[in-house]
Amino acid sequence: MIEYIRVVSKQRPAKRAFDMQVGAHLRVYVAGKITGDANYREKFSKAEQALTAMGHCVLNPANLPSGMEQGDYMRICFSMIDCADCVVLLPDWRESSGARLERAYAEKIGKEVVVADQGRIDEFLEKVGR
């Protein structure tokens, strides 16, 4: 399962044997495009299910209630990242200013940052999220 995730953080060397291995029990924050994506809850839910099946505790910003300002969401999400062991970026993370900020913040505070491989995300989610 580890082959479906590659490390994108250049700040710290990858701990490949530990990153997203089954049974590692990491606290994982999921980042990706929410604003402007009508199916964001489904997309984040699939990622959460897959990571939970791998034994991780998932911090999912798509579960936050609607009705707040972007700045409020970012403060909450940064706090969630503070609690996380690593951040997983969904393939569309570059399309989101919020996800780009989350990546930069996570790297700044020394968190591992990994990205789900675009070419294999569906296969990854199908195999792990059964």
Outline where the language-model segments fall.
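Conserved catalytic or regulatory cores that recognize and/or transform ribose-phosphate-containing ligands
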Residues: 2-130
